């Protein structure tokens, strides 16, 4: 797999609170230069990214209910609607982990379905925060996502105690079948990215996209 092929797996990511407008401009410039699939940014920066990426194939991905997932479902849906109005092409929502831990699976499904409806056809990725879940909980969450026919299930926010693992990616892929799997959190080098792809990931969320395609390790990156 060459650099251009790997680049098309990557959501080039900048989600930490201290990112400036100049950081977002740089992120967009890098995405254009290296032909990444998308930039993944907080929704306040969608208009800026839309301006910078106009006329390019790079998509805009944003996050909803991020990073905890404990917002009201109606709030997540409102975030989604406003993000799409602003120019978002893809939505990454955080599942309600507390509801999973409370065995409130109907509420989990309704939460995802509410956001999916607000997506109005735009691809929805559901972040499971796998480091907080048991294997059985990962499978159950993936089964719900498969039933709802979301576009992707995603491992992690990158803001918790663990990120993507090959084992979790493989488990998710076995469970969801044709639905996409996005590996995110701790994917900082070429070897790890390729391992995730081989395990079943069809998208990689990373702030170290340039290091990944150049075969270099960015040890300062956390997402």
UniProtKB/Swiss-Prot annotation:
Catalytic reactions of this protein: 2-deoxy-D-ribose 5-phosphate = D-glyceraldehyde 3-phosphate + acetaldehyde
Role description: Catalyzes a reversible aldol reaction between acetaldehyde and D-glyceraldehyde 3-phosphate to generate 2-deoxy-D-ribose 5-phosphate.
Residues forming the catalytic site: 92 (proton donor/acceptor), 154 (schiff-base intermediate with acetaldehyde), 182 (proton donor/acceptor)
Family annotation (PANTHER family): DEOXYRIBOSE-PHOSPHATE ALDOLASE (PTHR10889:SF1)
NCBIfam families, per database record: deoC
Chief place of localization: cytoplasm
Molecular function GO terms recorded: deoxyribose-phosphate aldolase activity
UniProt keyword annotation of Acyltransferase present: no
Domain of life: Bacteria
A biological process from GO: carbohydrate catabolic process
Name of the protein this chain belongs to: Deoxyribose-phosphate aldolase
EC supergroup of this enzyme: lyase
Pathway annotation: Carbohydrate degradation; 2-deoxy-D-ribose 1-phosphate degradation; D-glyceraldehyde 3-phosphate and acetaldehyde from 2-deoxy-alpha-D-ribose 1-phosphate: step 2/2
Coiled coil: none
Localization per Swiss-Prot or TrEMBL: Cytoplasm
Its EC number(s): 4.1.2.4
